[in-house]
């Protein structure tokens, strides 16, 4: 039990039906995401149509998403439990920050990991820019290096955010950072969103370039393997653009709205403030969308690849028919010449 009692308005927010519905809504999103994630993993394992490094990075994003969803579910269940058990005890309903040390740090670590994963996906597409680059022959090594970078890099920003935090304060639930870390955390989030937007801009440039190059190869290159690799590169870049955009779409507004709410907190009713903040769990929605994107893109890539292969086969069949016709005509011509002389 905490030694700090919640104010009556805070206690009313935490025990309100609206907040309980919010917990149920977030947990429902998480449960659905587990089912779609299972399907997306099967697709990547059995029906993979992406380059090796891209696939491995998507696996790392999925695993991180599962961990984040589990942590979020535990945090929400604990908050829901407090709202029911301590509904009449405002002095026990809050969480001391020390009680949230493990959950909170893992929650924010997986949050940053997802953005570094987007950065790795972009680097993978950037290094694949040249079709004949040696990078294509070292996909497994590249994925190991990039995944290790994703694991290590979030530690730096998180250390800066939390190194001077006091864990004796109290929070409404474990998604709330200690008060000393709030502004620094929002600075990190704002920088993260800006970096993701820049990555999306350059990823779109790569996508457009790969699309133009693929169309040119249709008319200038007749090597099936080269055209196949070019088409695969174009489709993989498109998938990465969608993944980065989905994270910006989910994380960007939640970070921006939270910053605005904190700045104008005094002019916003407390109940609305905490209720809306509780819905702004951007990465939960991003993790919900990621497996859906993988499933959708897999179907699109498989469909377009079948069309592409069929076109190549039709062209080859047409070429063979053309040469067979020429051979037949040549045979007739030489036969006629033999009869004439």
Swiss-Prot record:
The Swiss-Prot or TrEMBL record annotates one GO molecular function as: G protein-coupled receptor activity
Subcellular location, principal: membrane
Please provide the record's keywords in A-Z order: Membrane, Transmembrane, Transmembrane helix
Which InterPro entries does the entry mention? 7TM_GPCR_serpentine_rcpt_Sra
Residue ranges annotated as transmembrane are 25-45, 57-77, 107-129, 142-162, 188-208, 242-262, 275-295
Topology with regard to the membrane? Multi-pass membrane protein
Example GO BP: sensory perception of chemical stimulus
Name the GO cellular-component terms.
membrane
Q: Which domain of life is it from?
A: Eukaryota
Localization (cell):
Membrane
What's this protein's family per the entry? Belongs to the nematode receptor-like protein sra family.
Q: What is this protein called?
A: Serpentine receptor class alpha-28
Q: Which organism is it from?
A: Caenorhabditis elegans
